[in-house]
């Protein structure tokens, strides 16, 4: 039986801060003293199986070529008419398609529950054999009922069950899967039933995955929401803060984050943060006048929900929620072939600290998934950094990203230590066509951001607070430039900062960039990122060049509780 966050939550009283923190802290502990390793990954990428432009094997090869330690095949649910090489399913002899008959583009489609199980998974096994030092997960991009997209993956005790479990999830809960042929089918994961229309169905899906994880039907899983600003608010098919709170409440061990930095970073709108226009005063708004949202696109390649200090992400962290931030390529088609994308690992990476729990000298699928859930992760653009340690310490108590430090009373001297490293070069190549110049990846400054933790919000007792996507207590409390750090013999840059008399519960997170404050059309006077549309509008810088000019990294938070 898995250790259940959900069951602890049922016992804990929502009204008290400290019981809420205990409720949220259950599960893998980022503070464990076990030996581990930082591993780079990408878990959102597409092939010819769905709407990608290149073969399955090609995308796996690129993931390996750009040095990723792990990745997930994670492409759309529903139904598609071709395999991973672009061959139409209905040209196979004999025709292998199961389920209800449906056609797209003049060819019969195969429902994704079948292709994931019967065709994609065997290719994932081949990939694992071809790249034995890498880890290739079985995943898919869930079309979320009532909303947009989400990256999911499952790890099972018997690896062959990865595919059957994710097939059962897709069949039941993907809003684009119209097949009904498996209704009432008995599986190791329960009796299948279509539950794929409303937001409530999406919450049920998170609950289903949580139950499978708790009951041992699967070893591990993640549900991480993708390009979360692209469709705007929930009323227009996107997400509101209460949606994420609902998902996390239903599946605290599996639904634990989102992509703060969307893929498609070469696109004019840096990941479709929603299309926008900017006026002569630099005010950026949605390009469609009748759209009831205004996110202003991406800011330094990062969506509004994450980039806005005191915004939606901070609202969730202010509850003490273990809700973490990730980044991926969302590769479909490379920019040199007319697409909007970098290859997996070429530009954005999510770094996960995986712990070798069984001491075998390797890092398993389970250990990597546990690392993601721990929150001891960060993401970076363009290899701005390739190593980050972020710790808070009070005497002999210490916590890393995703972890918590609990003090019996006010902390007289909270020590914050940041250790980071940048490589000499990255993957930028000045080809004279798409990219005219490349700069070395070098951090200009790092912001230390903090906010108060006030406890979980009860949606029944505090309905207005539950839908509030802000945390007004969040602020930048310190900024560190090159004169603030020392470089050790290994080339690591080390920052030590002391915060005096901490008498309330708080969280701390980092962001860093290669850009100075007041960089025209990129940052404001204090270094906050500006809407990415400005530099295109005012200077004509766009595409891959814009992305390589404008590099950021974001850490995940440390939680400090004062009783």
What are these regions (language model features)?
Residues 26-38, 46, 50, 56-60, ...:
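C-terminal functional module detector
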Residues 195-224, 237-254, 275-292, 304-320:
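Histidine/acidic residue-rich metal-binding segments in metalloenzymes
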Residues 27-237, 307, 328, 519-520, ...:
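A metal-dependent hydrolase metal-coordination microenvironment
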Residues 77-83, 159-162, 260-279, 515-521:
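Short, solvent-exposed beta-strand-terminating loops
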Residues 227-229, 262, 356:
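Short, structured patches in soluble enzyme cores that scaffold and shape functional sites
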Residues 11-21:
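Bacterial N-terminal signal peptides
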Residues 145-163, 230-256, 333-353:
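Substrate-binding cleft/loops of secretory-pathway carbohydrate-active enzymes
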Residues 2-11:
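Bacterial N-terminal signal peptides that target proteins for export
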């Amino acid at each position: 039986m898995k250790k259940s966050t959900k069951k602890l939550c049922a016992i804990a009283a929502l009204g008290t801060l400290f019981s809420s923190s205990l409720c949220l802290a259950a599960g893998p502990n980022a503070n464990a003293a076990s030996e581990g390793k930082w591993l780079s990954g990408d878990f959102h990428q597409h092939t010819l199986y769905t709407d990608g432009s290149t073969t399955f094997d090609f995308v796996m090869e690129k993931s390996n070529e750009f040095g990723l330690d792990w990745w997930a095949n994670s492409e759309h649910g529903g139904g598609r008419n071709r395999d991973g090489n672009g061959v139409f399913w209905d040209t196979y002899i004999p025709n292998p398609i199961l389920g209800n008959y449906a056609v797209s583009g003049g060819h019969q489609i195969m429902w994704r529950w079948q292709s994931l199980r019967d065709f994609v998974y065997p290719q994932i096994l081949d990939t694992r054999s071809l790249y034995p030092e890498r880890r290739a997960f079985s995943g898919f991009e869930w079309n979320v009922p009532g909303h947009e997209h989400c990256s999911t993956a499952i790890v099972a005790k018997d690896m062959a069950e990865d595919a059957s479990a994710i097939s059962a999830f897709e069949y039941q809960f993907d809003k684009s899967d119209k097949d009904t042929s498996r209704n009432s089918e008995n599986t190791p994961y329960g009796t299948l039933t279509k539950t794929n229309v409303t937001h409530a169905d999406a919450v049920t899906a998170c609950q289903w995955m949580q139950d499978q994880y708790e009951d041992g039907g699967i070893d591990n899983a993640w549900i991480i929401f993708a390009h979360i600003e692209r469709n705007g608010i929930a009323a227009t098919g996107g997400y509101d803060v209460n949606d994420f709170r609902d998902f996390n409440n239903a599946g605290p061990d599996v639904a634990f984050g989102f992509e703060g930095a969307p893929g498609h970073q070469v696109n004019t709108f840096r990941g479709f943060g929603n299309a926008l226009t900017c006026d002569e005063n630099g005010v950026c708004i949605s390009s469609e006048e009748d759209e009831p949202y205004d996110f202003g696109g991406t800011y330094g390649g990062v969506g509004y929900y994450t980039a806005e200090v005191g915004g939606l992400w901070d609202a969730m962290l202010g509850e003490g929620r273990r809700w973490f931030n990730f980044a991926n390529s969302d590769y479909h088609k490379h920019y040199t072939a007319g697409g909007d994308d970098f290859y997996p690992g070429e530009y954005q990476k999510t770094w996960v600290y995986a712990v070798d729990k069984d001491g075998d000298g390797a890092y398993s699928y389970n250990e990597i998934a546990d690392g993601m859930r721990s929150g001891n992760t960060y993401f970076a653009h363009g290899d701005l950094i390739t190593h980050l340690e972020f710790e808070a310490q009070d005497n002999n108590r210490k916590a890393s990203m995703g972890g918590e430090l609990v003090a019996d009373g006010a902390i007289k001297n909270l020590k914050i230590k940041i250790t980071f490293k940048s490589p000499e070069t990255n993957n930028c190549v000045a080809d004279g066509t798409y990219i005219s110049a490349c700069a070395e990846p070098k951090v200009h400054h790092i912001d230390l951001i903090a906010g108060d933790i006030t406890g979980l919000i009860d949606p029944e007792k505090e309905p207005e607070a539950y839908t509030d996507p802000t945390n007004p207590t969040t602020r930048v409390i310190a900024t560190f430039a090159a004169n603030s750090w020392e470089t050790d013999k290994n080339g690591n840059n080390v920052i030590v900062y002391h915060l005096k008399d901490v008498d309330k519960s708080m969280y701390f997170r980092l962001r860093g960039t290669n850009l100075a404050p007041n960089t025209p059309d990129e940052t404001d006077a204090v270094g906050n990122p500006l809407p990415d549309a400005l530099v295109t509008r005012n200077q004509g810088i766009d595409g891959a060049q814009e992305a390589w000019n404008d590099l950021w990294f974001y850490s995940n938070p440390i939680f400090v509780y004062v009783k």
